[in-house]
Design a protein with these regions (language model features):
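Acidic pyrophosphate-coordinating catalytic loop
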Residues: 40, 53-54, 69-70, 113-118
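Core segments of cupin and vicinal oxygen chelate
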Residues: 10-57
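Long, continuous compositionally biased terminal/linker segments
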Residues: 45-85, 92, 99
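Vicinal oxygen chelate
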Residues: 2, 6-14, 71-96, 98-137
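Short, charged helix-to-loop "capping" segments that act as catalytic/coupling loops
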Residues: 27, 37-43, 85-86, 107, ...
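Short amphipathic alpha-helices in soluble, non-transmembrane regions
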Residues: 22-26, 93-98
Length: 137
């Protein structure tokens, strides 16, 4: 069982399958996979959940948005982060994003204020900023 805390995040996206491809490319090699699809409460579309391990331990949901693209610093989510175990995993995830043509916001680097905190930032297909990091404490 996972530790108490944030369990899952659902993102409203313009194209669920496109976003699913992005997140599977980014997170698949880290053990994340599509786990389940459910009809939304509207009943006209599906929400797709990805997780690393059991879906009951939390994950990421992708559901159809009602309107256009997210703009960085609009009201809503500014960014969210995925933690990995090693710097090499950060570098590998970054390389996959570069190879896919994703919009990189910041390349991998160590944080100047937090020793051992190593991260990169990328925008998903809808402009939502995603961080992949490791923290060698």
């Amino acid at each position: 069982m996972a530790a108490p805390g944030i369990h899952h995040v659902d993102l409203a996206v313009t194209d669920v399958e496109r976003s699913l491809g992005f997140y599977l490319d980014l997170l698949g090699p880290l053990g994340w996979a599509e786990q389940v699809r459910y009809p939304t409460y509207r009943g006209t579309e599906e929400v797709v959940y990805l997780a690393r391990g059991e879906i009951r331990d939390g994950g990421l949901g992708l559901r159809p948005a009602d309107s256009g693209t997210h703009r960085y610093y609009d009201v809503g989510i500014e960014h969210f982060a995925f933690e990995v175990d090693r710097r090499e995993e950060v570098d590998e995830a970054h390389a996959r994003c570069v190879a896919s043509g994703a919009n990189i916001h910041f390349p991998p680097e160590e944080d100047r204020d937090e020793p051992g905190y190593y991260a990169f930032f990328v925008f998903d297909p809808d402009g939502i900023r995603v961080e992949v990091f490791c923290w060698e404490r």
